[in-house]
């Protein structure tokens, strides 16, 4: 079995693959303060809950946009799994033709999503990932990663509104009853939700205009289903796009080793 870790700024998503099947997946908080032992015990409890042991895992791969956490995670893999994990970064084979001015600036999560997106859906392709930041990636009809856009995530914007506006409360991100809010909470929900739907449709439509062939639009991330339910431009919601990409990269980089 292969253990994959997608480390985001807010949450870390973990998955166990048995062949091509994602057997188990979990979401835990990303904490820069945790030690390798704390991460090890957290993961041990998750594995034990589904009847697995550290020894059931034969390979590991990590994608991270939080560099300070990597020391603890790599130590955890070595100490508890006795495995040196693959790290998505310089030196790993991706098969991507990246047209960024500096390819090293492309986040690991965006690379992993692009690998999975091309494999599953072909090209051209637009990938929208609703994470701590909302990222947009454009892959042209030649399967070249052309770049994209990065915007503040929905939760960041909501928290900023709460923090900077004295009379506005912290709210749940949810669909309001009406676009015209009748109270402060519903008005904020309408502004946040439909403001982001407008952002998605505006950016995606402009990216589509650059393509000679209509690109498929894939959304992933925790709030993708909510945004997709209100948007006309998203074709597919794939909640496990990043985990799929990690599995594919693991296979690409270990195939000669059997």
UniProtKB/Swiss-Prot annotation:
Its cofactor is NH4(+); K(+). InterPro entries: ATPase_NBD, Type_III_PanK. One of its GO terms (cellular component) is cytoplasm. One of its GO terms (biological process) is coenzyme A biosynthetic process. The active site is at residue 109. The keyword Mitochondrion does not apply. It catalyses: (R)-pantothenate + ATP = (R)-4'-phosphopantothenate + ADP + H(+). It is found in: Cytoplasm. Substrate binds at residues 100, 107-110, 184. Its main location: cytoplasm. Keywords: ATP-binding, Coenzyme A biosynthesis, Cytoplasm, Kinase, Metal-binding, Nucleotide-binding, Potassium, Transferase. GO terms for molecular function: ATP binding; metal ion binding; pantothenate kinase activity. SUPFAM superfamilies: Actin-like ATPase domain. K(+) binds at residue 129. Catalyzes the phosphorylation of pantothenate (Pan), the first step in CoA biosynthesis. Homodimer. This is Type III pantothenate kinase.
């Amino acid at each position: 079995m292969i253990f994959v870790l997608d480390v985001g700024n807010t949450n870390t998503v973990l998955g166990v693959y048995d062949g091509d099947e994602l057997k188990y997946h979990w979401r835990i908080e990303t904490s820069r303060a945790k030690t390798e032992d704390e991460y090890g015990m957290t993961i041990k409890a998750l594995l034990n809950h589904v009847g697995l042991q550290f020894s059931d895992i034969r390979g590991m791969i990590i994608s991270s946009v939080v560099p300070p956490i990597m020391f603890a995670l790599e130590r955890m893999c070595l100490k508890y799994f006795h495995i040196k994990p693959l790290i998505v970064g310089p030196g790993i084979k991706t098969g991507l033709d990246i047209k960024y001015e500096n390819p090293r600036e492309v986040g690991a999560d965006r690379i992993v999503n692009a690998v999975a997106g091309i494999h599953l859906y072909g090209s051209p392709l637009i990938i929208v990932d609703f994470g701590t930041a909302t990222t947009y990636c454009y892959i042209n009809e030649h399967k070249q990663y052309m770049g994209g856009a990065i915007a503040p995530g929905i939760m960041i914007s909501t928290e900023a509104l709460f923090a900077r506006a004295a009379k506005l409360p912290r709210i749940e991100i949810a669909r309001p009853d009406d676009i015209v809010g009748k109270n402060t909470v519903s008005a904020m929900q309408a502004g946040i939700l439909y403001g982001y739907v407008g952002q998605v449709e505006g950016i995606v439509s402009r990216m589509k205009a650059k393509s000679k062939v209509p690109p498929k639009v894939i959304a992933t991330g925790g709030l993708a289903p909510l945004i997709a339910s209100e948007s006309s431009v998203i074709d597919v919601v794939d909640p496990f796009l990043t985990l799929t990409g990690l599995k594919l990269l693991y296979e690409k980089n270990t195939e000669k080793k059997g």
